[in-house]
Amino acid sequence: MSQLETXYDVMRRQGITRRSFLKYCSLTGRPCLGPTFAPQIAHAMETRPPTPVVWLHGLECTCCSESFIRSGDPLVKDVVLSMISLDYDDTLMPPRHQGTVEETMRKYKGEYILAVEGNPPLNEDGMFCIVGGKPFLDQLKHAAKDAKAVIAWGSCASWGCVQAAKPNPTQAVPIHKVITDKPMIKVPGCPPIAEVMTGVITYMLTFGKLPELDRQGRPKMFYGQRIHDKSYRRPHFDAGQFVEHWDDEGARKGYCLYKVGCKGPTSYNACSTVRWNEGTSFPIQAGHGCIGCSEDGFWDKGSFYERLTTIPQFGIEKNADQIGPRGRRGSGAAIAAHAAVTAIKRLQNKGDQA
């Protein structure tokens, strides 16, 4: 391995100066690891060759790739040309023979990362998704055989997404239903945030292992908190200030979108912290509630505009006379439930850190 060209060697060959390299390492770690990890990122890139990656596509809309190529920190060109060796991706590479996959599997047996976008259909022996004249189901099993680890990009690969919506005539399934003997990290979202995708790759390059995962197989660094808890509209939820109808006074004042269907209280993602388009905005900031696209089964859970629960809410600006005995009971239950979920989450985090 020492004779192989390291990621740093590749960058120097591309004309990158030492100063620019160190700046790059600092910026690369900022979204996911923090600037203090820049020395570790630099050491990893100086001592390890680019990680070989095979990226396959099944039943999907390619939105994960569309998100990935818009990463700002790091830029996708730096990821693809310097950090990893993207040996095969039929969307992001020039036309090449399918033999490229076989060559990578032979050359880097047990060392390459298999990234999967989309999912396999099981019905009719996988004939509902044919890539290069072969069922994607068979290609997926074959490519995973000698992989070091597997990345499930997006909700299609992680949960099944709309392809698996009832009645699911193609029997589309998430990839963990097919690949059961490999370390796997799920990066759900429809699509995932670009910097979340490149952040996962950065972590794996830096530490040579998968990041810490939650019980559903998602990286805790990005999926460890509810969107609701970090949303700038959260104070309006606590104050009982809600948008009741689209374009009402509450909507114009930026009140909480919970009553018009926002799934932020039950969705775990980095949307309210990392945000989209290089930190510019996210759906709730743009005035639309979260649809919970990173959560399993979101596509079959009813309208995006249905309220999560009918339990009454009350806020800090209302007094007991306005709420009434009935409202106090219902609202108290709602707040108790909300507080309980938050407290349980904090205890779980403390337990994980212990």
Curated annotation (Swiss-Prot):
Q: Can you tell me which residues bind [4Fe-4S] cluster 1? A: 61, 64, 156, 190
Task: Select a single GO molecular function from the record's annotations and give it.
Answer: hydrogenase (acceptor) activity
Q: Which cofactor does the UniProt annotation name?
A: [4Fe-4S] cluster; [3Fe-4S] cluster
**A GO BP annotation:** anaerobic respiration
**UniProt cross-references to Pfam families, sorted A to Z:** NiFe_hyd_SSU_C, Oxidored_q6
Can you tell me which residues bind [4Fe-4S] cluster 2?
228, 231, 256, 262
- Major location, coarse class? membrane
Uppermost EC category: oxidoreductase
Q: Consult the record and explain the modifications the protein receives after translation.
A: Predicted to be exported by the Tat system. The position of the signal peptide cleavage has not been experimentally proven.
Q: How does it sit in the membrane?
A: Peripheral membrane protein
Q: What does this protein do?
A: This enzyme recycles the H(2) produced by nitrogenase to increase the production of ATP and to protect nitrogenase against inhibition or damage by O(2) under carbon- or phosphate-limited conditions.
- The protein's assembly and partners: Heterodimer of a large and a small subunit.
Instruction: Provide the family line.
Output: Belongs to the [NiFe]/[NiFeSe] hydrogenase small subunit family.
* Name of the protein: Uptake hydrogenase small subunit
Source organism per UniProt: Azotobacter chroococcum mcd 1
